[in-house]
């Protein structure tokens, strides 16, 4: 059988993958793809066979795939025998946890993987190989579409274990169905970490049963628009929050897509909504008026870390989050925490002297130290690793140890390198260009947001995560993450427009080896995503697709 190279195993100095005339369009680009002659044609019934696995979790992957595939295509699945079934999921223990091999010929589809995640990602690739993106989008396939797969061999594995996206719902609230759409798109691009920014000065979005005022008061503010410059608060009652059952529903939804959810409660800074809910023990100046913030920027109204009740509050919040979100990481923020009110508070002044420091930033470190010690006392299945924004590095991190993770955003390359040198793990989330809430073009039609339109799809794609990182530090780099802040973004359609297709570019940086990446090649493959976005019913940057 004559083979045609779709993507060659290239060295770092070589050109982009060579595309055949009949090349398929896959994002993220796999390690190797070889097109063969022939096609696999689906009939009305598909016999399947699955190797046994603890908990039947590979069968669970296939069952979830079957629900969508049958609903969108009408193809019925039947249990067959290994070796004879048309779709076979076979264990291959030599592969890495998220790796897979996918082979399609005229008679069979064979998938090999070592873990359920690998089978899931192979099935995502399979859906991209279909002649229509309808199945991937969960929509019915048109009667005029002949359901086939090209004969192909794919060998694939991700570059990074952390391939993330953060959405800020503290500033604006979008609701369960919109979050599920985000998770669907992430899954299509093999992203596996949803960082859920749930608290801010402008809103608290997660139910904490021990502190009901967090959502009774903290989830609501007196303006939908956030004030900035000439833009003033509009006086409209605005807000919303997720009950714990809502959050658990989303956790289950994400799990089916092999996405882990990382909750973030940003404390002790970015906490005016919490302070407004419980000023008696969270405020540095409880005698003053406190309300959920109506403005953009950073509020000076931070949590009083010298109040034992405030420390207990934080511990209680972590306890409830642990029972909602099973993933082994919790993000506690740590960025942009003004120390002005601490400097004016006698208890904070006293605590600073007691810990033997003159740097008020160390009060924040001391606060985190107490929370970390609290978590360490929990049963093993309830312990969590802590993630912080890289401003934490401005203090003396020695009390925290090096078993924390630094999410590097401002001066990201240098901050990540500094964290790695301190023996900490790090995640690259550079403000420029991975803050994809920023304008993605200079067109007059661009929605109002931060930036000057220079964070284009091309700029996002061309960021090189491990550039100039010494080899002995690279094992500290967990992966990459795009972030989306919502000060200016009031509706889900604008989130989608700014997010897409830039999220696909970040996904490819997280999955595809650097020596295979090329923007012209990516842009060519990106054209197929127009159908996916339209079928999915999501907004996107149409100007990118027109710039072929």
Where are the regions a protein language model picked out?
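Bacterial Sec-dependent N-terminal signal peptides
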Residues: 1-25
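Feature activates predominantly on carbohydrate-active enzymes
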Residues: 95-316, 320-329, 374, 481-486
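Soluble non-cytosolic domains of exported or imported proteins
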Residues: 55-60, 116-121, 173-177, 241-245, ...
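Active-site neighborhood of glycoside hydrolase catalytic domains
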Residues: 274-280, 292-404, 409-418
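Flexible, acidic glycine-rich loops studded with aromatic residues
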Residues: 385-391, 398-404, 410-548
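Contiguous, structured surface segment used for ligand recognition
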Residues: 21-160, 494, 509-544
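Active-site beta-loop-alpha junctions enriched in small/polar residues
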Residues: 170, 199-203, 266-270, 335-339, ...
């Amino acid at each position: 059988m004559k083979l045609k190279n779709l993507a060659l195993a290239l060295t770092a100095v070589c050109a982009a993958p060579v595309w055949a005339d009949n090349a398929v369009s896959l994002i993220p680009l796999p390690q190797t793809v070889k097109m063969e002659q022939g096609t696999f044609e689906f009939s009305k019934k598909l016999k399947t066979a699955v190797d046994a696995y603890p908990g039947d979790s590979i069968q669970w992957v296939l069952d979830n795939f079957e629900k969508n595939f049958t609903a969108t295509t009408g193809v019925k699945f039947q249990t067959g025998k290994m070796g004879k079934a048309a779709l076979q999921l076979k264990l291959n223990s030599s592969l890495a946890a998220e790796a897979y091999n996918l082979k399609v010929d005229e008679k069979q589809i064979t998938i090999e993987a070592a873990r359920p995640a690998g089978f899931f990602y192979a099935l995502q690739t399979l859906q991209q190989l279909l002649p229509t993106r309808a199945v991937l989008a969960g929509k019915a396939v048109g009667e005029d579409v002949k359901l086939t797969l090209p004969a192909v061999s794919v060998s694939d594995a991700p570059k990074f274990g952390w391939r993330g996206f953060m959405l800020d719902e503290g500033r604006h609230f979008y609701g369960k169905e919109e979050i599920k759409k985000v998770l669907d798109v992430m899954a299509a691009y093999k992203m596996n970490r949803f960082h859920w920014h749930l608290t801010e000065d402008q809103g608290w979005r997660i139910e904490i049963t021990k502190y009901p005022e967090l959502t009774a008061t903290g989830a609501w503010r007196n303006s939908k628009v956030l004030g900035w410059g000439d833009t003033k608060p509009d006086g409209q009652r605005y807000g919303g929050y997720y009950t714990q059952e809502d959050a658990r529903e989303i956790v289950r939804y994400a799990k089916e897509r092999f996405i882990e959810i990382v909750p973030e409660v940003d404390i002790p800074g970015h906490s005016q909504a919490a302070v407004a809910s419980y000023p008696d023990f969270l405020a540095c100046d409880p005698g003053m008026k406190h309300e959920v913030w109506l403005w953009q920027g950073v509020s000076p109204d931070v949590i009083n870390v010298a109040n034992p009740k405030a420390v207990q509050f934080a511990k209680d919040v972590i306890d409830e989050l642990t029972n909602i979100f099973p993933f082994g990481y919790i993000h506690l923020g740590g960025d942009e925490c003004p120390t002005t009110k601490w400097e004016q508070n006698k208890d904070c002044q006293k605590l600073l002297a007691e810990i033997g420091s003159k740097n008020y930033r160390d009060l924040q470190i001391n606060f985190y130290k107490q929370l970390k010690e609290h978590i360490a006392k929990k049963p093993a299945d309830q312990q969590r690793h802590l993630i912080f924004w890289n401003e934490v590095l401005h203090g003396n991190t020695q009390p925290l140890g090096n078993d924390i993770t630094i999410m590097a955003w401002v001066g990201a390359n240098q901050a990540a390198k500094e964290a790695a040198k301190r023996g900490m793990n790090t995640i690259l989330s550079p403000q420029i260009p991975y803050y994809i809430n920023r304008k993605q073009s200079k067109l007059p039609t661009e929605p109002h947001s931060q930036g000057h339109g220079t964070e284009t799809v091309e700029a996002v794609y061309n960021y090189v995560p491990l550039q100039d990182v010494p080899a002995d530090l690279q094992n500290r780099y967990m992966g990459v993450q795009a972030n989306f802040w919502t000060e200016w973004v009031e509706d889900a359609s604008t989130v989608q427009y700014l997010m897409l297709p830039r999220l696909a570019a970040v996904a490819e940086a997280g999955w595809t080896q650097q020596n295979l990446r090329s923007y012209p090649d990516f842009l060519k493959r990106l054209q197929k995503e127009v159908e996916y976005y339209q079928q999915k019913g999501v907004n996107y940057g149409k100007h990118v697709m027109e710039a072929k």
